[in-house]
Amino acid sequence: MTKEGKILKALSGFYYVNCSGEIVTCRARGNFRNENITPLVGDDVKIQMSDNNTGYVVEILERKNELLRPKVANIDYSIIVVSVKDPEFSSKLLNKTICLNENSDVNIIIIFTKLDLLKDAELENMKEIMNYYYEIGYQVFTNSEEDIDKLKEVISNKYVAISGQSGAGKSTFINKLAEHLDIETGEISKHLGRGRHTTRHTEFYQIDDFYIADTPGFSSLDITFIEKEDLQYLFREFHDYDCKFKPCNHMEEIQCGVKEAVESKQILESRYEDYKVLFTEKQNQKRKYIKER
C-alpha cells in the first residue's frame, strides 16, 4: 500500500512522515543512497507501507525550495533569530545567513532577541539597524509578546524553518510561541561568547496551525558554493542603483551607484562593508584554489 505524506522529523536514519495526521516511521529505500539522494525534513514523499505499520520512503516529490542551513525543504518562511547581546550582534553572520536564504529564493523573517540587555544608546543604534532591514523589504520582529502575536498571524498555516547563531535564543523563542512545548535550552558560555548546541536534529513541531523547525545553532557559515559575482544579487537593495560600468562588482569601480548610495547613507554602511568582506573572501578563496592546483 502506497501513501503520500510530509517528513516532519529525521533522526538516526529514520524518517517520521505525516500521512493525513498519522505519523509513520520510515526508512529510505537503498536506491536513494546509491544515487546520493538524502530525504529532507519538509519533503513531500510517497511511502510504501510494511506489515508492522512502518514504511519505506520510495519517492521524493518535486521540491519548491531547499535550504542548506537549516537543511530543510518546501518551507514558506525562513526565520533568522539574531541576538543583539550575549552573544554580541554580528552583522556579518546575519548577512551571510540572509545570502543563503536569498540564494534559495525563500521568504525571510528576522527576529531580534535580547534587546532588554542593551543600554539606551545601544538600543537606539540597534533600532536604526532593525528599521533598515525592514525598509529594504524584510519582515522584522522582536521576541516581545506583542510581536509574537503578530508573527503568528503571518505564519498561520505555513511551514517555517528557524535558524540562527548559537545562543541567540531559538529554542527559547519557540517555547514562547507555544508554552506546551519544552525544547531544551542551553546557557551561554561566557568564555567563548557562544551558545551550547542544544538542538541535535531537525524536526517540524506543530504549533497551533503552523509547523516550525528548530535546527542546530551555528557560530559560522559556509557559502563557498556561491560565486563572488553572484553575491551582489543576494543583497537586494543593491538592485535599486545604477552603475556606469556593467558588470559592476561595487568594489573598486568608479561611478558605482551602490558606493554612492553608501556615501549618501541610503545603504547601511555596515551592510556594504560586510558585502566587501564576503566578496574579498570569495576572491581569496578562488586565488588559493588556483595556486593549489
Indicate residue ranges for each PLM-predicted region.
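Structural detector for short beta-strands of small beta-barrel domains
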Residues: 1-11
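Helix-rich effector regions associated with P-loop NTPase G domains
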Residues: 13, 36-51, 61-78, 83, ...
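SH3/SH3-like beta-barrel fold
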Residues: 15-19, 26, 47, 57
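Beta-strand/loop nucleic-acid-binding surfaces
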Residues: 23-38
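Short, Lys/Arg- and Gly-enriched loop/turn segments at beta-strand edges
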Residues: 52-60, 88-90
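Histidine-anchored nucleotide/phosphate-binding helix
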Residues: 92-107
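Canonical P-loop GTPase G-domain recognition
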Residues: 117-168
